[in-house]
Amino acid sequence: HKADLNAQFIEKKTGLIVRPTVGINYSKNDYRMKNVQMRDESGDNFIVGNPKRFHDGYFSLLAQVEAGFTNKTWADAFFVSASYSKTDKELQTGSVQSKVYGMAERNSDSWNISARYQKYNFILKNMQLNASLSHTWDHSLTVDTAYRKYYWDGGYIVSQRNEIMGKEPSMRHYKRPLTIMRTNLDYRLNAHHTLNLNYHLSRTGNDRYDDLDTSFEPSK
């Protein structure tokens, strides 16, 4: 299931442009697997069957608003935006389909602010400036707390280890802020020659910690 809303509003007096965007995506992902090992109805014997995936749901949300101006004396285009995105993902398998999960999940939240600017004939005639700046706060959480071993029939047995890591329960956080700046200055000397200057800056962090796993060493 997917739904998107895009709109644009223009304030006539000032020329202010506002563009809201909302998007939602949901999928249960309960399609059938082919020829996988699973338990029979008694739970005592293994058979080869075609069971449905039972823990593979996906949900995402995006909300953004952009506001700015075009065709002004001081800018051909100038926009600022703010957005929020969220993803909830159930985890069904590991690196191989024989390793089945039934409770592990990964969730993320992300906030972003950005600005972009474009100007033709910037300072000099035939000089064009394009510049953008954005910063993102990204937080991801992997929940792996169940002492269970799952099978493709949806049943499980109690285990001594968690599902993904095979260790003690874990609620692993990843915080990765990201700043990106891009600047492009293009100057047309004549019909055959141009001078182009580009600058790119990228800075990211990697803050990791765990609420439950005492053996995990946090890092920044």
Stretch-by-stretch model annotation:
Residues 99-101, 108-109:
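Short, low-complexity, polybasic intrinsically disordered segments
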Residues 1-4, 13-96:
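Periplasmic-side early beta-strands and strand-to-turn transitions of outer-membrane beta-barrels
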Residues 3-13, 113-116, 219-220:
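Feature captures outer-membrane beta-barrel proteins of Gram-negative bacteria and organelles
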Residues 34-50, 97-99, 160-163, 209-219:
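Flexible, solvent-exposed loop segments that connect beta-strands
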Residues 64-87, 106-220:
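Face-selective signature of the C-terminal outer-membrane beta-barrel domain
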Residues 7, 24, 201:
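A short beta-strand motif that forms part of the nucleic acid-binding face
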Residues 22-32, 53-58, 101-104, 114-120, ...:
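Low-complexity, flexible helical/coil segments
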